[in-house]
Amino acid sequence: AIKIDELSKYCKENKIKAIGMSDTSNLCGSLEFSEQISKSKTQPIIGSQIKFKFNDIIGSLPIIAKNSEGYKELINLSSKSFLENTNLEEPHCNIELLFKCSENLIILSGGINNLSGSLFQKDRLDELEKLYFSLNKNSGDNFYIEIQRHGDVNEKNFESFNLSISKKVNAPIIATNEVYY
């Protein structure tokens, strides 16, 4: 785990221009992160891994605010994920809600433990392809297919799939790393 003050110091020492943080299901750490990182003259990038329902699967998608309007949309999505589920299901939004408010958001496909990874591991590749096409179509140029390398046995095959499908979907690849603070 990385402490935010240590991360801020690292950013300053290494003249890092921007760094992002993505909370899980909420934005509770975004204020502290933004304040600390800004002290190092580094641009904070705020995101959240919000759960969405696609067909019958519920899983997270990393969402990043492009600007202040995007930050408001993140707050809205996070709040609705908790407020609009009246039964005992885990907090989530329907994927169509994301499509309606994606203009000021960057959407990542997620790793092996996210919504897309769940579809991949269940061998529901046609549905995963439809999800990627829908995310790309409804977000303009703001959808990125994610690859990660954490040593998970399924990541290598998932990476190969994502590299291949990115050309078909016409979505760029982004390499990310899950770090916890």
Model-derived features with residue positions:
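Phosphodiester-processing cores and adjacent nucleic acid-binding clamps
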Residues: 1-181
